[in-house]
């Protein structure tokens, strides 16, 4: 009996230890989920500024291409694909937060017209689900269902992202009309250079904060450098801290200028934005167009038949 109680107590302690360890890991691990686009969601009510600039460009300074493909026209209450392509060289490696090299992640923000939103799962076809894969989209804000964000996700697998979109029906949504609408997209690959608070990440170039002579360079145990610069005019010493990641370009005893690069620029990613247009088409207009085309075709057929009949009459009169 005592042995059974002891075994039960040991089992309980082991389970408790595992639970505590798991909680500590979840809290302290460097999760990519706290990266973009959460920064934009926390800092900006709308991801697109009045100038047309998407706010992701404030932290991702390099300009890179992005492409979007949507149908020219869609009917009300239909599901269609918005395909966003974020091209980059898959062989590239980026500097991670710990200074090591790793693969690039990608992310995207899709700004749809009012009324357009993410298609519900039961409206998505199996073919479209296969294109989407394991991606999980979310609204930029609970009250902004027309703005969708995704990422960061592995770039090698998702450099092409398929958004399933549901078009609105003006019959039930009075704010929507049968018009041509713009769609805006922003796509990013790799980490940013600046955090929302204005501080630099380790994925950018570091410049000298003072002119003078490089007196001492100390390599830190966990990576990175402390560079002591002695001002040539007054001898004042300034210490510049370089995080792990960027490669050092200066050496001790070297004379440097203010804002001179102390490191290389390790950034291999960047952000791009683009736009497209889509027409929300009235089904009655489509039906009218089809009726008009059918009437034109019938008129052409009757004209040809009438012409052939006339030619036969002429031929019979000539033979007579």
Curated annotation (Swiss-Prot):
<dbReference type="InterPro" id="IPR011054">
    <property type="entry name" value="Rudment_hybrid_motif"/>
</dbReference>
<keyword id="KW-0793">Thylakoid</keyword>
<feature type="transmembrane region" description="Helical">
    <location>
        <begin position="286"/>
        <end position="306"/>
    </location>
</feature>
<keyword id="KW-0408">Iron</keyword>
<comment type="function">
    <text>Component of the cytochrome b6-f complex, which mediates electron transfer between photosystem II (PSII) and photosystem I (PSI), cyclic electron flow around PSI, and state transitions.</text>
</comment>
<dbReference type="GO" id="GO:0015979">
    <property type="term" value="P:photosynthesis"/>
</dbReference>
<feature type="binding site" description="axial binding residue">
    <location>
        <position position="36"/>
    </location>
    <ligand>
        <name>heme</name>
    </ligand>
</feature>
<keyword id="KW-0732">Signal</keyword>
<keyword id="KW-1133">Transmembrane helix</keyword>
<feature type="binding site" description="axial binding residue">
    <location>
        <position position="60"/>
    </location>
    <ligand>
        <name>heme</name>
    </ligand>
</feature>
<keyword id="KW-0150">Chloroplast</keyword>
<keyword id="KW-0934">Plastid</keyword>
<keyword id="KW-0813">Transport</keyword>
<dbReference type="GO" id="GO:0009535">
    <property type="term" value="C:chloroplast thylakoid membrane"/>
</dbReference>
<feature type="binding site" description="covalent">
    <location>
        <position position="59"/>
    </location>
    <ligand>
        <name>heme</name>
    </ligand>
</feature>
<comment type="subunit">
    <text>The 4 large subunits of the cytochrome b6-f complex are cytochrome b6, subunit IV (17 kDa polypeptide, petD), cytochrome f and the Rieske protein, while the 4 small subunits are PetG, PetL, PetM and PetN. The complex functions as a dimer.</text>
</comment>
<dbReference type="GO" id="GO:0005506">
    <property type="term" value="F:iron ion binding"/>
</dbReference>
<dbReference type="InterPro" id="IPR024094">
    <property type="entry name" value="Cyt_f_lg_dom"/>
</dbReference>
<keyword id="KW-0349">Heme</keyword>
<keyword id="KW-0472">Membrane</keyword>
<keyword id="KW-0812">Transmembrane</keyword>
<dbReference type="GO" id="GO:0020037">
    <property type="term" value="F:heme binding"/>
</dbReference>
<protein>
    <recommendedName>
        <fullName>Cytochrome f</fullName>
    </recommendedName>
</protein>
<dbReference type="InterPro" id="IPR002325">
    <property type="entry name" value="Cyt_f"/>
</dbReference>
<keyword id="KW-0249">Electron transport</keyword>
<dbReference type="Pfam" id="PF16639">
    <property type="entry name" value="Apocytochr_F_N"/>
</dbReference>
<dbReference type="InterPro" id="IPR036826">
    <property type="entry name" value="Cyt_f_lg_dom_sf"/>
</dbReference>
<feature type="signal peptide">
    <location>
        <begin position="1"/>
        <end position="35"/>
    </location>
</feature>
<keyword id="KW-0602">Photosynthesis</keyword>
<feature type="binding site" description="covalent">
    <location>
        <position position="56"/>
    </location>
    <ligand>
        <name>heme</name>
    </ligand>
</feature>
<dbReference type="GO" id="GO:0009055">
    <property type="term" value="F:electron transfer activity"/>
</dbReference>
<dbReference type="InterPro" id="IPR024058">
    <property type="entry name" value="Cyt-f_TM"/>
</dbReference>
<comment type="similarity">
    <text>Belongs to the cytochrome f family.</text>
</comment>
<keyword id="KW-0479">Metal-binding</keyword>
<dbReference type="Pfam" id="PF01333">
    <property type="entry name" value="Apocytochr_F_C"/>
</dbReference>
